[in-house]
């Protein structure tokens, strides 16, 4: 019985389609992983420029469903076909694999004003379901770096999408290259129920 504040079709599309989110990020200058455009034909011309390792994921699934890590062409082709088989959308994301800690960053929005609410570290539990996280905590030594490097561009993403009221969040990785990259956004309360 939680409210849905999404009054913009664009906001809903960006929050539920990872490809549209990435396009909007690129438009406003928010950092995202390098990606590769592939079609179901998986032609030699498409595959020859891919630099491994990559991540393959459907644009319309959450909780890491359909996501695969690929070190070579054979793994990429199999992962692409798998992601395509479980997706309702013909677009599949193939992007550079990022390595580093993951964060969920929550914002509160009121009358178009956007404020960072909390910055939480996510630690997945090896050996458990792929969409299971064991620990989420709000204290992080990386908050200042995030604010300095990414916070303003995330606010631009929300504004450009038409997010004006409610709660929104982004998931991000601090890659081993020392920079944050945005993964996806939500325009709703998060599933981990940290608002309770």
Please annotate each region the language model reported.
Residues 8-12, 138-144:
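A short acidic, glycine-rich active-site loop
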Residues 70-73, 144-151:
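Electropositive phosphate-/nucleotide-binding environments in soluble metabolic enzymes
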Residues 8, 58-62, 189:
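Short, histidine-centered active-site or binding-site loop motifs used for metal coordination
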């Amino acid at each position: 019985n939680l409210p849905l504040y999404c009054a913009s079709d664009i906001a809903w599309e960006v929050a539920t389609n990872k490809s549209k989110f990435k396009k909007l990020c690129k438009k406003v200058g928010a950092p995202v992983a390098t990606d590769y455009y592939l079609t179901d034909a998986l032609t030699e011309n498409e595959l020859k420029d891919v630099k491994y390792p990559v991540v393959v994921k459907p644009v319309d699934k959450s909780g890491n469903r359909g996501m695969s890590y690929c070190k070579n062409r054979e793994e990429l082709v199999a992962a692409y076909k798998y992601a395509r088989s479980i997706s309702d959308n013909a677009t599949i994301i193939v992007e550079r694999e990022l390595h580093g800690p993951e964060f969920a960053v929550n914002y509160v929005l009121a009358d178009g004003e956007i404020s960072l609410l909390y910055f939480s570290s996510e630690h997945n539990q090896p050996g458990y379901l792929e969409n299971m996280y064991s620990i989420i905590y709000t204290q992080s030594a990386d908050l200042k770096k995030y604010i300095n490097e990414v916070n303003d561009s995330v606010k631009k993403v929300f504004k450009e999408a038409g997010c004006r009221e409610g709660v929104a969040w982004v998931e991000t990785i601090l890659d081993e290259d020392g920079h944050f990259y945005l993964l996806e956004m939500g325009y709703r309360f998060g599933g981990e129920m940290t608002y309770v």
